[in-house]
Amino acid sequence: METAGQFAPASAAEARERYEAFGPTAQVVVKEVVKAMGLDAEAYEERVTSEVVETARDVLFAESLAVQVGSMTEFEEWRADTDCEVTLVGAENVDNVVWHAAPFTEQAVAATFQDELRAAVGTLRRQAFGRIYREVV
């Protein structure tokens, strides 16, 4: 079993703090993307809304989440010991699982995969943000 990512908040306050900290970075990322696209200041004002910057912040937060990567057996062992309610997405008859738990919410999400680790991690992080953190941050 291994870990991908580094952020595993211990509390709702820690999650909110991290999310808020990504605000300025999200603004810079969006501004630089707009520049790279060759849009002028007028187009920036018209097209870049607070929702665009918020989406960038959501992605930055989600992509920083720590995710456990392991076999189905390792996941089932972990699941037997956790107090979290686990939401599992994906096919049941595969060899590997990625998961993220937020014990302070008593929730965890997991995604199964066979070969595409990178895709599974991305899917899981989006699921974790949507199912766990959206209401917290």
PLM region spans:
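Acidic, polar-rich N-terminal leader regions of halophilic archaeal proteins
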Residues: 1-137
